[in-house]
Regions:
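Short, extreme N-terminal segment that most often corresponds to the first beta-strand
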Residues: 1-13
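Generic structural motif
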Residues: 9-11, 49, 59, 94
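Short linear proline/tyrosine/threonine-rich motifs used for host-factor recruitment
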Residues: 6, 42-44, 54, 89-93
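Acidic, low-complexity, intrinsically disordered interaction modules
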Residues: 24-81
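Short amphipathic alpha-helix segments
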Residues: 16-26
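Short, compact, well-ordered microdomains
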Residues: 83-86
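DNA replication sliding-clamp ring fold and its partner-interaction surfaces
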Residues: 14-17, 65
Length: 94
């Protein structure tokens, strides 16, 4: 699975998730670690060692995101694109 659709709590959380995990201008994957998952909230660590939380629609979305992003954290894949549509983020890895 190289693409996933993640439903966030709202549009702001979707924009935050897309901005935190991928920088389109430099085609750079920023996420380095998943620090914690608390129900539908995910706490991410970035390359600059900062930590940020993102609230997803429900617990299933959190589980799906963690499963999908694990290979990126392990550096087996990189994020290649993100698209935001309202409260939805489509993430592509390669």
């Amino acid at each position: 699975m190289n693409q996933i659709t993640i439903f966030c709590q709202d549009k702001y959380e979707a924009q935050k998730l897309a901005a935190l995990i991928f920088v389109k201008e430099s085609v750079e994957t920023c996420i380095t670690e998943i620090l914690n998952v608390i129900e539908n909230e995910i706490v991410l660590s970035l390359k600059d060692k900062s930590a940020h939380s993102v609230i997803l629609k429900d617990n299933n979305q959190a589980v799906n995101f963690v499963d999908f992003i694990q290979s990126v954290v392990e550096k087996k894949h990189k994020i290649t694109d993100t698209q935001i549509i309202d409260n939805v983020v489509k993430i592509t890895k390669g």
